Amino acid sequence: MSDITFPGDLVYELSPRGVGPTRWTQKNPPNYVERSHALLGRTVDTGRVWDIIAAAQYLHAEHDGVTLVVGGGNAAGVLAAYAAERSPGISGVILHNPPPTHMEPSAPQLLNVLRVCDIPDVLGLIAP
């Protein structure tokens, strides 16, 4: 982390739903939380994008006037890119080793996303 931050930068770590210390179990049958997202016409990854946006809104309210950059590795970086595209308060994104397309098994699962765009398209939308 020290290679992308500067002295005095505030760094916050977000564990969106189903990740980290609040991770839900992966028993058979599939987890009820994951199944309830599907019943609502969403995916868990869609909820994670909204978690990132909500955290960004909170940080803007707490630290008025700061530049907010989000990032992540692999699929989490792609979720950060989608959050940056949807939230004007996010100024930049740092991605580490993102999947090249939503056709990859490791890519975030977002319903019908390939009808509209793919990962390079979203990165192009948020590029300066």
Regions found by a protein language model. Name each.
Residues 55-125:
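Primarily recognizes the serine-hydrolase "nucleophile elbow" in alpha/beta-hydrolase
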Residues 1-62, 102-108:
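Cap/lid segment of the alpha/beta-hydrolase catalytic domain
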